[in-house]
Amino acid sequence: MNEPATRIPFGDTPPTRCAFYRRVCDLPAHIDPPELGRIVVRAEHIAALVMPSALGHAVHADLRRCHRHDAVPAIGPVLAHPRSGRWTFLIRPDLPDDTALFTEMFRLDISIARPGATLALPSPTDRGEHFRRWLHLPHNPFRPSGLTVLDSLRACTARTGWLRTPATGPRP
């Protein structure tokens, strides 16, 4: 199965990119602040899991593998943040509001962006691809269940023995 193209089909300005995010991806994006052209979305009907890129790569591969064996798509929009070495998986907001889950994710260096959080999306005003870029561009309103991504994440950490990376030292 071919992956969708990772380019934005409309012009490359913040207003046209926002229009693409709103119309095609059902992401209520807006420009904030207007003079900088940064595109953000308030997580209302979406949530996100933000994790180290090495773990994100493993989760993405696991979700692709699951998708090949299942009729239900498992991969939704995924963002890379190259400067910070993080990946963001946009998901449905169906993760439980549970202290044990937050503790588990904290130990793995994973953040849960719950409804109400502000998420920055790739913008044509970003300088190169050093800030944010799409690894898996949304081409429709689909976002996987947070529980599906969480299951994949748990499978990957169990297989690899993943632990929180140290805050000091060089970043990949």
Locate the predicted segments by residue.
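Signature for HUH/AEP ssDNA processing cores
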Residues: 1-84, 93-95, 135, 139-172
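Residues in well-ordered beta-strands of folded domains
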Residues: 50-52, 79, 90, 111-113, ...
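Beta-rich nucleic-acid/ligand-interaction surfaces
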Residues: 86-88
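A recognition module on extended beta-rich or small alphabeta surfaces enriched in W/G with H and D/E
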Residues: 113-144
